[in-house]
Amino acid sequence: AKCIEVSQRVRWDIERDVIRGRRFDFDQKFLPDGLSRVPDLAFLRPAEARFLSQIQGRTYANMFALVERFIGAKVIELSRDHGLGDQVAFEALVRLTDEELKHQALFRRLDAMAAAGMPEGYRFVPEPNVVASAVLAKSTWAVLGLVLDIELFSQAHYRSSIAPDPDLSALWKDVFLFHWKEESQHAIVDELEWRRCDATLTAEERERGVDDLIALVADVDGTVQLQARADADYFLRCAGRAFSAAEQDAVHDTLKKAYRWQYIVTGVQEPRFAEVLQALVTPGQLDRIGRALAPIVAHVAS
């Protein structure tokens, strides 16, 4: 009921409340240094560093549009469990789905606005419907674990990196302020649904859910590596000067680290996610998940 009350109070419109007739200021960064890892590339000139943050910001919007495709589909599926039962839960899930559809429209709008001020040749490689179909083929328990991870890291990114950075595009910051307002309620609903799903499982079903969650993390890692390569190639083509082989390798590795950090590590290290996961799985299962994540975490820290 609290989530519904807040949803009603913070509800916003894309054009009226967020965009407000503005355009992106391409003299400013989009993604903050704490997420982009751009300062690790000390050989970049200021304009190049800013451009790389804008590329990452455009991908950040597209990644959220992608994940909200399968989040909305899964949540509307879950709402059927409550349609003739708990009407408060039913309304909360329907509202969440409606907001996720709005967020997809917002992020499509951002991509078009970014395209207007960036060189041609940018590609968002993953196909949202293909990715969503693959995710939704996994067990509901695993999908809900991934969804909670995403909802929590999106909030953490805003609080710790986007909101405090004075050098970001004002429009960019507003986008993620309004996004954060609604995502804060989504995480609460997602956690309740994950716990509800978990309570229905046998030990064998939960073990399969852990297998699926590990597989989903590997799929996410493959997706972000694919986009990191595309974005690094785009940057190197459009930066306006030649880079040494070592510098090109550094750009590729930094983007791979940045995307693993943004879309995997910040989520699994979020205290609330760790707390919920630990409450649902056995120590052995938690260890298996940790071992699957270890190479990714080690690469990000290197």
Residue ranges with predicted function:
Residues 1-91, 112-128, 134-141, 201-302:
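Terminal targeting/low-complexity segments that flank the catalytic cores of oxidoreductases
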Residues 160-225:
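Aromatic-anchored, glycine/proline-accented short structural segments
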Residues 128-180, 184:
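Loop-centered beta-sheet repeat module
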Residues 64-72, 96-111, 144-158, 179-190, ...:
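Alpha-helical transition-metal enzyme core signature, strongest for iron centers
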Residues 80-84, 98, 102, 109-116, ...:
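Alpha-helix capping at helix-to-loop junctions
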